[in-house]
């Protein structure tokens, strides 16, 4: 074997040329104290607020308090294996999560890691969880309907795409059920060959501080009814640390913004923001920030407003996408004047108020029609629904007033009696079993029958049966009528005449 000096020198030259002198520099600090999910860290002098750090055991955290001599870090995970003196490394990044269609059908934690056992995510894009909401110029006023499939809501408290509608009530009044039915109601638009991309609404459910069994049940219902394929579940359950419960809504919102910014439509339900506020209060108190009313920190209003402002309807230059938010707030004994409920009511564009006593009377969904409002929804109602539901709100208000009065007197004149009868039947008509959302055109026909006196002769107990029979008849024998309402989005004179004929015949058969 002969050694050629020229070859050796060539190899050496190549190696010297490829030698990389770059050194990897990372700023490292040390843990001074740790406990209750908060670490005090010394030595990270150049860290920025909200920046991610990594502890020596691989757990991540976020710097929230920047003080003169130390940094307060909240820990995204267990603090059990973190000891005083451990090293902490700056990551130079803000909290971000995976986004995009690859997340549809999956259950992830607050940092976007899959927790459903279906393997790793195939998402390529990532987004920061806490970004600025769209300004005034890119927005457009709410004008497209966001159907929930619930008669009581779509007729009286309509929701539009890009709106923020609060769902508020005590525990066990059916708040999550409203979100669930709204998700299920988007199914027909996602079926093969149904409509165009503009009709599809992608759903995101953020569970904050819920029991794991509750979240599992929610996922199971979506899966059984074929609604999981267009939904994303973000879960920060009761057993997760407070920072995870605090960041989960922001993470879910970032996932929804992906659809909004790509000209698609998304709907996000935060269930519920009271628990996020409690988690934020816990973090703030442990970081020794000064407490305010009900011991919440002073910026808890800003926490919720910056989250809910990210729901928007964008104008055509920005792709016409939308993100609709349905935040949930749990009240204690119907106290709407507590700190968090008043905050969120003032931020949102209306509220759906659910009441325990209505729920126990069997009026479900237990919507209190008098206290519930939708500040922008009427602009998003189709003309057909406006035509039939215009009078129903007034009639129900009069009915409630009279019913309170009628408890005292027995001799009522004919007009009062008529009003009470009509009100009782309309209230019965607005009841709806769970998991059975109705298409808008079917709701229109049913309410048309109620407002035009077709129920007045029936016993209250027969109203439900009348409605079911009418819908079955229309679906089988008169689908053209339903299609006409769906396409024209209004009740033309021609459709009205045909409807009256159908209703007259059906009423005779029914009686």
From Swiss-Prot:
Main location: membrane
Annotated family: Belongs to the ATPase alpha/beta chains family.
Protein name: ATP synthase subunit alpha
Subcellular location(s) per record: Cell inner membrane
Subunit comment: F-type ATPases have 2 components, CF(1) - the catalytic core - and CF(0) - the membrane proton channel. CF(1) has five subunits: alpha(3), beta(3), gamma(1), delta(1), epsilon(1). CF(0) has three main subunits: a(1), b(2) and c(9-12). The alpha and beta chains form an alternating ring which encloses part of the gamma chain. CF(1) is attached to CF(0) by a central stalk formed by the gamma and epsilon chains, while a peripheral stalk is formed by the delta and b chains.
Site feature (Required for activity) residues: 372
GO MF terms, alphabetically ordered: ADP binding; ATP binding; proton-transporting ATP synthase activity, rotational mechanism
Keywords associated with the record: ATP synthesis, ATP-binding, Cell inner membrane, Cell membrane, CF(1), Hydrogen ion transport, Ion transport, Membrane, Nucleotide-binding, Translocase, Transport
Membrane-related topology note: Peripheral membrane protein
Swiss-Prot/TrEMBL catalytic activity: ATP + H2O + 4 H(+)(in) = ADP + phosphate + 5 H(+)(out)
Membrane found in the keyword field: yes
Binding of ATP, residues: 169-176
Enzyme Commission number, as recorded: 7.1.2.2
GO-annotated cellular components: plasma membrane; proton-transporting ATP synthase complex
């Amino acid at each position: 074997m002969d050694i050629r000096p020229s070859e050796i020198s060539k190899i050496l030259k190549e190696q010297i040329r490829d030698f990389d002198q770059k050194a990897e520099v990372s700023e490292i600090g040390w843990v001074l104290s740790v406990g209750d999910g908060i670490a005090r860290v010394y030595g990270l002098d150049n860290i920025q607020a909200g920046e991610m750090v990594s502890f020596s055991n691989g757990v991540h955290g976020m710097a929230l308090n920047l003080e003169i001599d130390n940094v307060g870090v909240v820990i995204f995970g267990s603090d059990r294996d973190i000891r005083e003196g451990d090293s902490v490394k700056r990551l130079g990044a803000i909290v971000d999560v995976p986004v995009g269609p690859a997340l549809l059908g999956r259950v992830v934690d607050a940092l976007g890691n899959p927790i459903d056992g279906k393997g790793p995510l195939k998402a390529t894009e990532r987004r920061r969880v806490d970004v600025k909401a769209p300004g005034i110029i890119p927005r457009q006023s709410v004008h497209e309907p966001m159907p929930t499939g619930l008669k009581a809501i779509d007729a009286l408290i309509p929701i539009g795409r890009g709106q923020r509608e609060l769902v508020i009530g005590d525990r066990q009044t059916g708040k999550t059920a409203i979100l669930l039915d709204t998700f299920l109601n988007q199914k027909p638009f996602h079926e093969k060959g149904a409509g165009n991309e503009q009709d599809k609404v992608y759903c995101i459910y953020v569970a904050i501080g819920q029991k794991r069994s509750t979240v599992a049940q929610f996922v199971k219902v979506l899966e059984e009814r074929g609604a999981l394929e267009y939904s994303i579940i973000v879960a920060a359950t009761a057993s997760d640390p407070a920072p995870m419960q605090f960041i989960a809504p922001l993470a879910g919102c970032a996932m929804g913004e992906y659809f909004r910014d790509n000209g698609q439509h998304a709907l996000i339900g935060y269930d519920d923001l009271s628990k996020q506020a409690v988690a934020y209060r816990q973090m703030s108190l442990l970081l020794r920030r000064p407490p305010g009313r009900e011991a919440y920190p002073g910026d808890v209003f800003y926490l919720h407003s910056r989250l809910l402002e990210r729901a928007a309807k964008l104008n055509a230059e920005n792709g016409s996408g939308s993100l609709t938010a349905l935040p949930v707030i749990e009240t204690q004994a119907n106290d709407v004047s507590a700190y968090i409920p008043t905050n969120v009511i003032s931020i949102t564009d209306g509220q759906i108020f659910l009441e325990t006593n209505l729920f126990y009377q069997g009026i479900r969904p237990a919507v209190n029609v008098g206290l519930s409002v939708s500040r922008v929804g009427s602009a998003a109602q189709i003309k057909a629904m406006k035509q039939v539901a215009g009078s129903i709100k007034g009639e129900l208000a009069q009915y409630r007033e009279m019913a309170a009065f009628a408890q005292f007197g027995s001799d009522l004149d004919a007009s009062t009696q008529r009003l009470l009868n009509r009100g009782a039947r309309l209230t019965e008509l607005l009841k709806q079993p769970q998991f059975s959302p109705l298409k808008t055109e079917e709701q229109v026909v049913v309410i048309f029958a109620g407002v035009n006196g077709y129920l007045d002769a029936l016993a209250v107990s027969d109203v439900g049966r009348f409605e079911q029979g009418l819908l079955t008849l229309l679906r089988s024998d008169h689908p053209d009528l339903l299609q006409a309402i769906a396409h024209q989005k209004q009740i033309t004179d021609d459709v009205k005449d045909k409807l009256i004929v159908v209703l007259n015949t059906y009423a005779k058969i029914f009686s």
